Amino acid sequence: MLEGAKSIGAGAATIASAGAAIGIGNVFSSLIHSVARNPSLAKQSFGYAILGFALTEAIASFAPMMAFLISSVFRSVSRVTI
């Protein structure tokens, strides 16, 4: 039962990567729209888009880290109690 809960928790933690992919798509979609509306601010908009991409990707990097922590912590706890 604990193994099943561990797998469900790790899977739920990695679903966040789908949300990050949607967020990155929104960042660059907004960049394309802003450059189409005002081409003179393309350089500044690109800098903001790269910052948004980096912050979104940083959040996405927490998902595999949490999945790893969930699987390793539950593995060590189950060994101690048995």
Curated annotation (Swiss-Prot):
Subcellular location: Mitochondrion membrane
One of the record's GO molecular function terms: ATP binding
GO cellular component: mitochondrial membrane; proton-transporting ATP synthase complex; proton-transporting two-sector ATPase complex, proton-transporting domain
Highest taxon, organism lineage: Eukaryota
GO biological process, one term: proton motive force-driven ATP synthesis
Membrane topology of this protein: Multi-pass membrane protein
UniProt similarity note: Belongs to the ATPase C chain family.
Name of the featured protein: ATP synthase subunit 9, mitochondrial
Native source species: Malus domestica (Apple)
